[in-house]
Design a protein with these regions (language model features):
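Charged, gly/pro-rich active-site loop segments
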Residues: 1-17, 99-189
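Short, conserved active-site entrance elements at the starts or edges of catalytic domains
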Residues: 4-37, 42, 53, 186-189
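Catalytic cores of transferase enzymes with a strong primary signal for eukaryotic protein kinases
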Residues: 20-22, 69, 152
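Residues embedded in well-ordered secondary-structure elements
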Residues: 23, 39, 97-99, 144
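Alpha-helix boundary recognition
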Residues: 26-27, 86-87, 146
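Short beta-strand segments
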Residues: 29-77, 83-85, 91-96, 103-107
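Generic structural signal for secondary-structure transition and capping sites
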Residues: 30-31, 90, 134, 160
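Short, intrinsically disordered, mixed-charge
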Residues: 86-91, 127, 131
Length: 189
């Protein structure tokens, strides 16, 4: 860990992100990977677009009353994972950048807001997603499919952890193994 990396993004301080850093990270177009449970108990993971509302947006009356903020996902009408979440709302998800090692890891529940509807609340959220993932012309991607029903889920994190920088969390470090200390390995000594 002592050497410097060419990509300066790797030089971020090792540790948790601040609320501001989390907000900046979540505004980027990284895919959310959602894990839910099939009816037989097997895990199922799906990549999906997401929209993040931070706690202050929730407090200002966005319709979300989550204490940690919330994530919105929009499955298509025939998506199996929408049924999985409807039947068992327990889920986990991660949003990460494998180049910079930034990540947000969550555990929580999925709240069904709309079940397979056309022209619901999901449209405005999908437009925000399309801009973030596809750029200013992103909403034009939605136009030919606006007549197709979709679900809307609010993912409510009960646990939310963040990480940035190349390095180990101190809690993983085993002391007295004969190598450098955690601080030495992370250039903090």
């Amino acid at each position: 860990m002592a050497e410097k990396y060419e990509n300066q993004e790797h030089q971020k301080p090792v540790g948790k992100m601040s609320a501001e850093e989390m907000g900046i990270f979540l505004e980027k177009g990284y895919t959310l990977r959602l894990a839910c449970l099939k009816p037989n108990g097997d895990p199922f993971v799906v990549p999906c677009w997401h929209h993040w509302e931070n706690k202050s947006e929730c407090d200002r009356g966005s319709g979300c009353d989550c204490i940690n903020g919330c994530f919105w996902v929009i499955p298509r009408s025939r998506s199996k994972w929408a049924e999985y979440l409807k039947n068992d709302p327990r889920c986990s998800w991660v949003i990460d950048d494998d180049q910079t090692m930034e990540k947000i890891l969550c555990e929580g529940v999925a709240e069904l807001v709309e079940e397979s509807v056309v022209n619901g609340k999901w449209v405005g959220i999908a437009e925000k997603m399309a801009v973030r993932y596809l750029g200013p012309d992103g909403p034009t991607y939605l136009v030919p499919t606006l007549n197709q029903p979709r679900w809307l889920f609010r993912l409510r994190p009960t646990k939310l952890r963040s990480w940035q920088g190349v390095g180990w969390a101190k809690s993983y470090w085993v002391k007295e193994t004969g190598g450098p200390s955690w601080k030495e390995a992370h250039n903090l000594a």
